[in-house]
Amino acid sequence: MPFITVGQENSTSIDLYYEDHGAGQPVVLIHGFPLSGHSWERQSAALLDAGYRVITYDRRGFGQSSQPTTGYDYDTFAADLNTVLETLDLQDAVLVGFSMGTGEVARYVSSYGTARIAKVAFLASLEPFLLKTDDNPDGAAPKEFFDGIVAAVKADRYAFYTGFFNDFYNLDENLGTRISEEAVRNSWNTAASGGFFAAAAAPTTWYTDFRADIPRIDVPALILHGTGDRTLPIENTARVFHKALPSAEYVEVEGAPHGLLWTHAEEVNTALLAFLAK
């Protein structure tokens, strides 16, 4: 299997599993919590059919990548992404992040610039700043909320994932219509296969402050979000994000949950392909 080494922990290397398919302009897809690069399958198929080269990789601690106990912060995640881009020598690339993966996109552009990057897309994003503070009243929740997530993951991450995916896909509305029990089970299995340390460390990165990163986005951008997102509510994320980045193309998918890559794949793919074609 293909791996890219991004670091070292004690006697073992930290390797990221990746897949690289197709030809044409490269599109790098960066997954969300607690999934893997395979969560992009409905977008990967559409992009390949449209003539793009599609690269997915599993973030450290997730999927088939190494499961280290270090490096769970967006500076390191962005450095890992930079290593992927440099190792594959990608040029004129499009970075597409989903949920937690949008943080890599913002921090990469802020830290490494856009010499290799043509466009960026933020799907169900966590920007600009999830933490509710005195100077950020639009934040989604106080730090205690995220501390509670960490505690629940440490207590029984498998039970946590079951509840998490209920709201991730809005199963009370979409199960049996827009998503099957089998697809939900696959998401749970993917989550369970990731590392225990990453599962608890990841939520502490969600309240990273990206407000200083946003002005450095100097390439065409897409912000796309579901109005029914219970995980990262649109009023705390995409709508505030768009005000901070008014040049971005902005799309709201009516009624879509956080996991809209699967439940509303047609709407997502239509908007993404139209953005890429411009």
From Swiss-Prot:
Domain AB hydrolase-1 residues, every copy: 26-264
Keywords, alphabetical: Chloride, Oxidoreductase, Peroxidase
Enzyme class: oxidoreductase
GO molecular function: chloride peroxidase activity
InterPro entries assigned: AB_hydrolase (IPR050471), AB_hydrolase_1 (IPR000073), AB_hydrolase_fold (IPR029058), Epox_hydrolase-like (IPR000639)
Active-site residues from the entry: 99, 229, 258
Keyword Oxidoreductase attached: yes
Keyword Ligase: no
Domain of life: Bacteria
The EC number(s) this enzyme carries: 1.11.1.-
Subunit structure: Homodimer.
Family recorded in the similarity comment: Belongs to the AB hydrolase superfamily. Bacterial non-heme haloperoxidase / perhydrolase family.
Protein's name in the database: Non-heme chloroperoxidase
